Amino acid sequence: FDVQVKRLHEYKRQQLNVLNIIAEYQMLKANPNMEFQPRTYIFASKAAPGYFMAKKIIELIDALSKVVNNDPDIKGRIKVVFMEDYNVSLAEMLMPAADISEQISLAGTEASGTGNMKLMLNGAITLGTLDGANVEIHDAVGDDNIFIFGLKTPEVMELQKKGYNPMEYMYNNETLKSAVEFIQAGVNGKSFGEISSSLMNVDQYMALADFADYQKAQKLSAQAYQDKERFAKMSLMNISGAGIFSADRSIMDYANNIWHTQPVKFKEEAPKTSKKSAPMTKEEKKPAKKSTAKKVEKKAEPKKEAKKETPKKAEPKKSAKKTTKKSK
């Protein structure tokens, strides 16, 4: 499972992933019997409501999946899946299942990222540029346990100063040219001229410049996956190296390098027990019964007083009878 799960944005370069899938699809179409490591490409993301190009890229991924997944010449060796409504619950299922973690943003554009850390902790091997937290992952696991490709930040800045011309890269790479023209011609009956035009004329995030190196990294990842023992070791190295992203390590760095404070040993005292908090014995429970009895007696007192009051009301009648006898 080759997984790219994150917010959809041009700088995160889902379009670069799509170009590689198209190139592999065209290669298999031309030679259906060639040796090829089967791979399922999984996308999961959301686009901002007003981000037109991001929504078009989602539409392109969906259209491409219908073409590739239903082509009998491919024989299921490439599958493209787009998971809708990406959220934490979906990530909880996708990240443990991932074999390859696509972290392919243009160098110098990603602040850090945390998805790459979660995938690393779940044993996925990072395939990415030296951007954001990929740099720390690379430092933690070493060259042999990660697939790094693409321009570095100083090289990106230098190319921007000189003036980046995407058409130059396109016409110097026949595979890339064919993939871009595939998009330009429309996919599954839908037009994607906006995407192909942007790639050929602007390509702000240099997907075409990194395409050839990205393809090499994809081939290396396929070779590594075929060696099950090697791939398992790479996965374990990523899991064991993920400790650098723990909150404990981060807070310790703050304490040492920014706050300049020393750790304080905190000795937790056992909670003091009191008689009130201790469980009551049978003898302690007896007074409680007496108190309830008194309450019952007090409630019964008003009823007795009510009975005594009844003869007092009858007294005037007796005096009335006596007066009648005297009058006779």
Where are these regions (language model features)?
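Low-complexity, compositionally biased segments
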Residues: 5, 119, 134, 213, ...
